[in-house]
């Protein structure tokens, strides 16, 4: 599984590009996290293997996205594109996707980055798990560096404030300022499905590490307190 993924990345993309390297390691970490959560949930071995595989492949659309556009989230929906790639016979063979697992793989990859799952998949355990693992690693990455926005102001947009206080994730197009970005990161926690994912988030102290890296900490204190209380209550 990992060998095929490594060959796919190294043979088709420029690994010297930081964005490609970052997505490669993100994919491997999400795969590891997915396996860990599935094991904690005592899933059958075959389901654990599938969760591990989908975790590795969830961002496969990102590599072409960067190569074509040199940016993320502007011109392409990488979840939809990733599912399109994995639906091709050559990718199915390359990654040894079993025919009876294919629809599960396609659905999970397609919807992993959407604001919410459709009603038909809201209880799908693979979709829920991969979304958890992905968010946990995104929060980890943001805990390791400063948040950078072109509009570096501590002003929260009306739409972002409303969504945050409703307890929902933030719509990407509403994120316009540094403050919006901070709240959008915190709001990822609202969409975490499994208690064990929240336990990992708490144990690794990612939320407080993000707070420690902030500019103008006092402005954000109440929002961080709210999220930490939410984690404790869940």
Which ranges hold each PLM region?
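Short alpha-helical hairpin
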Residues: 1-13, 54-60
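His-Asp-centered metal-binding catalytic motifs of divalent-metal-dependent phosphohydrolases/nucleases
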Residues: 48-74, 78-82, 86, 103-115
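Divalent metal-dependent phosphate-bond-processing catalytic cores, especially two-metal-ion Mg2+/Mn2+ enzymes
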Residues: 20-28, 32-44, 57, 68, ...
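Glycine- and acidic
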Residues: 14-18
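Acidic/histidine metal-binding catalytic segments
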Residues: 42-53, 92-111, 122-129
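An active-site-proximal "capping" alpha-helix that borders the catalytic cofactor pocket
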Residues: 29-37, 76-91
